Each structure stands twice: as structure tokens, then as C-alpha cells.
């Protein structure tokens, strides 16, 4: 034997040492083993493989203003690309499409004017195509129950753009943090080509569903029959962070907020532990959690994520996985993407996977009550944007004018940004935010929504003007009198309607003295209020169309036509009789035609009372002076006003109109007079308007008006879902099977149920009660809903300065809040009547003065023949709207020839619907929701006829014959 170039002999000292070397090695190994703790015995379980899913959770806002987060996300994708190219075992899931969008915007070489760095882009897309990087099809982690109906339909549109442009494919949606979603989500995802949904649900406030962890994955089905295979990771520490904070799969990486490992954070007194011991504790927790739920499959998915973490953490995860797999062959860890896990589960267990239906919105959209003015602007954009889009589609078809796709793209991007789960003007998280960044975040949210409102108003202003604009072939128009003005009234809904129009005199110093129908010349009754606002009833304004009226003026200031009724607190017309209490709250709204009282004067609180809740404790809003109640009556309008001098709840106006089946309530809040919040261990106060209805509590159902249909609650809740409150689109209904009350709402959107809100003032010194939201239950004690108007906070506990007083979280919007409601009663629940009522209140008739009246005084651009179907939007086909090419030769305007019509059946009744269009069409095809897959060629195109199944959303592609 040779050692160091020398021959060893039996006589050499080196040989004697070498002869004892095996024994020394054995002794050292024995000593080391004695110091190493034995491997833990894990609980018995069906689970043999844990699929670990690395990703990073991004919030718009939260730690930085949205625009800075966009920059951060772009840098993050660069790091994902670098890590993937340097490590062949690297796996990653990109949480949101918006992150890729932001990265793509910045992929431009310094020497380039327009062309992008296509080689670099191709590298990322190649990794996505290979499956090593998974891409969510969802734009972001959204407050899905707050989103507008058409906005929600476009949740996966930007993914489809990536698919069409770069050839990437994904069947996975990932939405984290938000603890639940409404019943419309499976429909939207499945009809966009998405098969799988992963949700990391944050339960730090309340529950999501008790189907996790035992019953996951399951097929989650919408009322229309669409379904997705959903995996739910949920937990009090965040859900999506479970791999790091619950199961300790990575004992090396640091928590992004504390600079400690999660194990150190949650086990400060644990004492010295080896890395393997920490992991064993975590895996034991994982197995116990799933065993306790009755989990039966051999594989499980664990999300490995945290806020804004970088993909470099995967190196630590790989180290930890290798350590574990070398020591515990009985349960193996596998770094993967969600599709890998889903494919395994479906291949083995598809026949055993259950299907569940139900609503389980976590109701985090309540956070948007912190900025009620911004949220009101967002809801305005939700309704008005599809209406403006449909108007401009009609103009594009009939006027041969390019469709303004860029305006619509901006509008939807602003809405998506605010409707993402961090979107709200707020005072930040305790000790997290720097003051300057927090204030800039709030300014940006205000800017987005103010820009959205301005964009919408410009689209309608120019669009309605264009609708009336004569062509060069029309005869010149001469106004009969300089005191006559042409008023075009537009209906942005897909059914003819009679509704109130509000308009002011076209010029200062002139008053309206007459209004007539331009076609029939019939004079119309109207009223003018003390603010110079004129009201009249426009009858039978056609679907997606207009009627023209002639307004006659005279010199002079506007004077109210309403007559005050002295010392009265009661008013009536042919439909309603309204009576107020001396304190200004509503005592009675009586439906004359149905001989039915609508409100319950014996409820927990009076109708329309403003309730303040300090922390979890009920309080009253001070009213220093007795309210002044005035009743005014005119030819059309009857109103009761309540003025509360020097009070935060400054005024209420109740309006009823002859010929209109609704009573309206407008509540004004003077934010400058709100009490300073705090003093009860709380940072904020919550304000609710109380609406007790005269509907029996027996067999009481809450009808939740969503984006696509009504959910019946509590029947339609997913098992274990949060049941204390609900977010609705246009209307919330209450029915006992015989009597119904309907409450439509504009700015407010979140409602709590009776029994889930503290309404009783406790005596001073009384022991604190457990918050009502945790003790309320179904069946409800009465038919009352509390409209959560706003959350009021004035102090922020900042990271850099400590506690600061903030003058506002909505800079530039002022401190006057307006909350509009409309009330209507009925017998048995009528989904068509309720849907139309809510939609009409949220999209009022729009009036515009035009210089020249349109050649047709009344016109409908689009209409349908079924009342249970709505045209949600009409727009150019998505793959024809953005070209991104530059020509050296100036081009003529490129006209749109292909459009899509979005239809929604909202009652659950199969139907055949006929659609009338302003142009002839060459062909029609039924498409999927994202407009990239043909489903069916339609044979009946003259007129266009479509068969709809119950609750179906249909996207119909038409190719028009321009000019015909």
C-alpha cells in the first residue's frame, strides 16, 4: 500500500497508525450518533408525497404605493428568470398576470424606440412553456365580490393576450390572501379555459370553509354548471405562507417582516433544535391537520410563499428538501408547480373527488369601506364603463369610426388595480408603512379613480354628441327658437325603461320652463328643486338607445316648483305613503298599490338611523339640534328633507315620483364633523345605516345580488363559510316566500345582518361582550340589514414616525359622503323585477344637450326579446383591438368588423333570445369567455338567435357588413 509516495511496511510507524484507523473511524461515528437526536416518528397518514409550491405573494399597495410595486414586480420577474436559468431543478409559480405585464413593459433595449428585447422575452416564455414556471391566468388576487360584472368576466383577458402573443399555455389560476370568493368565480374561470384554482386563504379575521383541509381538492361548481378543481390552503398565519410559517419546510429563509426565521418567530422558547427537528415539527403539524380533517389521498399540496419574497429562497428550500428526503423516505417532499400536483391527483382519484356548490366570500372587500369616496368612484366605473363601451361599439358600427380601445384598456386597468385586494385608501398596517409612502399610496388610488370618472364622462359626452351629429348628407337643421335646446336621453341597459331624468338649465341665468317629447311634441310634467335640478319622467326609452326631448328656457334664475307643506312629516303619491319620526328617521313607507307596509318600525333600530360602532361597541351619532323636517310636493316629485344642523349625519332626502315604483333615500355625511375614533381599544369606527323591513323572520332568505345571478342565503353558503355579512352588486333582497323587500344601493356595497352587529348601548363600566360578528347566527332574529357605509380612521401607526394623525385617506376628494338607496316591495320573489330594479338604479338615464337633434328622435342600437337576459357589454373582438405595429406610410383608420356581445341569463331559466342589431351581420359564433376558443357556429343570424341554458354567460362573436 502506498501513502504519500512511500511504501508502508509492518515495521513503519505510519503503518501501525493506519492499522488502527478503521477502529478510530467507528468510535468517532458512534460518538457522533450519540449526539444526534433520533429521527422523529411521524404520525401515520395516507400522505406519502408533499408537493411544495414556491411562489411570492404581491399586494398592490400595502408596503409601497402601487406604482412602486409595479417596479418591484418587474425586478422580481427578472430574478425568477435568472434563478430558473441557473438551476435546472428550479420551480416557480407566477402569482398574477399583472406582474408579467409590468415586466414586459420594461423589456426594451436602451437603443430601441419601440421594439422590445424579444430574445429575453422568449427566454421567460420558454420556461413557462416547459412547465418549470407556472403562470396564473388571473390578473391578480382580487376582491372578487366587489368587482363589476363585466370586469370580472375579463379576469383572465390579459393572460389570453400572453397566450395569443407568445404561445404560452396555462390552466391554473392562483389567488391568495383573500379568504374566499363568490359563486361566479368557477363560471368565469372555467369559461376562460382555466381548470384549476389554488387559493391561499388568510383566516386572521374569520373562517372561509370547513371543507379544507379534509375535503380538498374538490370541484367547485357555479349555478350554471361550470366547475373548477380547487385547492384551498388556509390558516390564521396567512394560508399561502403555510410552507414557511406553519410547516417549517424551510428552516433557513427569513420572514420578510422580522428578519427572523418563521420557526424562531413562532417558537421563541423552543431552545436549540436541529434543522431536521424543526422540519419534523412542521411535518407533524401538517399530517395531524390533514388527518384530523379526514384527508384520504396519498399526495398533498403545500404553498411555500410569503409577501414579496424573492426566488433565491428556493435554494434554501432545495437544501431543506434534500435534508428531509435523506432522512424520511416514508414521506417525500417534491418541489413542484400546482399543475404537477393536480395532474397526479386527477390521474389517481378523479372519480373520488367530490363536487360542492356555494358562496364563501371572505368579505375582505369590506376593507374598501375605509375609502368610501374612492370606492364610490370605482363602482361608478364598474357600471358606466361597459355602457360607454357598448355605446361606442354602436357608433363604430354605424359611423365607420375606429373604436377607442385604448380608453377602455386604461379604464379596466384602473379598475383592476383598485379592485385588487390591497386597493383602498387607508391608514396602513400597524408599524409597517412609512408615512410618505402611505400618503402617496392613497394619492395614487384617488388618481386612478378620478381619471376613470373623467374618462367615462368624456366618452359619454363625445359619444352622445356623435350619436346626434348630422352627416354631410343631412339637411341643415334650424332651431325653432333660441330658447329651445335639444336634450338627448340615453339608456345604457338592454331593456326599454321608464325612469326619472335629472338635468339643469343649459346656461346660467336661464330657467327651464318647458319640456316636451321631440317626436310627439307632447309636453311633460317636471319639477325643479331648490338647487336648480329639474326632474322629469322619460317614458319608454329604448334599449341601448335614446329619446330626444326639447327643453324650453326663459331668462331668470331657476326657482323651485315644489310647494312646502307646513308642519308636516308625511307625504304621499299614487304609489307610496311616507312618514318620518320626529327624530328624522323613517317610520313608515307604505306601498299603496299592494296595500303593504315595507318597513318594520319595531326593529332593533329605526329605519335609516346611522349607527356608530366603536370597535365592537354600539354608540350613537350626536345630533346637537332637533332635525328640521320639510315636505315639498310638485307635479311629479314629492320629497321630504331632514336637515341636522352641526351634525355629522347632516341631511336625508326621501324622494318619491309619480309613475315610478320606488322610494329613494339619499343620506349625506359631513366627514369634518365625525367623532374622533378610538378610546375603546380601537383604531377605527364603523358606520351603518339601519334598514329593518316588514318581512317575517320565519323562512327568511337573503337574496344576494351578485355579478351574474342571485344567491339565496343561507341556503347557498359553502359549508363553513363566513355568514355575518355580504357584499352585493346592485341589490340585496329579503323574502319569506310571501313578502319581499328590495334595497338597491349605489355607493355602499357591504351589508351586515341582524344579530351580527352590536346595536345596544352598554352602561358605563359594563363588561365587554364578545363581538357580535362572532356570536350572530342563522336563522336571523329579524329582517334587518345594516348597510356598512364607511369605516372611519384618523390615525396611522407608521414604521418611521410612529403614530400620526392623517387628515384624510382620500386626498383631493373632500369630506362629504353621499349614500343613495332605493326601496321597493313585492310579494313572492321575482328575480327579473329585482335585477332590473337594481340595474336601473345603478345606471341612471343619462341626459346630454346636443347642438343638433339626431335625425331619428328615438333609436335603439341593440335590444333583446327576453326579460331574464341582459346584454352586459358589446365590444370589438379582443384579438383585433391592439396592433402594436408602426408603418412608414400613414394608414387610413382601421375599422372594426368583428364584435362580441356578452349575454347573461340571470334567473335560472333556459331561454332562446333574439338580438336586434343596427347593422347586418355575415356570421355569428359562440366563443368562450376570453374570446379565443370557438364553441359553436350559430345558424340563425337574421335575426341573431341564441339558446341560453340556466344562468349561462354567452359570448357571441359577430362579423358585420360595414355600412349595411
What is the role of each PLM region?
Residues 52-63, 68, 226-475, 479, ...:
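Catalytic grooves of carbohydrate-active enzymes
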Residues 122-136, 150, 182-259:
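Surface-exposed loop and adjacent secondary-structure segments within mature catalytic domains
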Residues 36-146, 162-164, 219, 223, ...:
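N-terminal catalytic cores of secreted or lumenal carbohydrate-active enzymes
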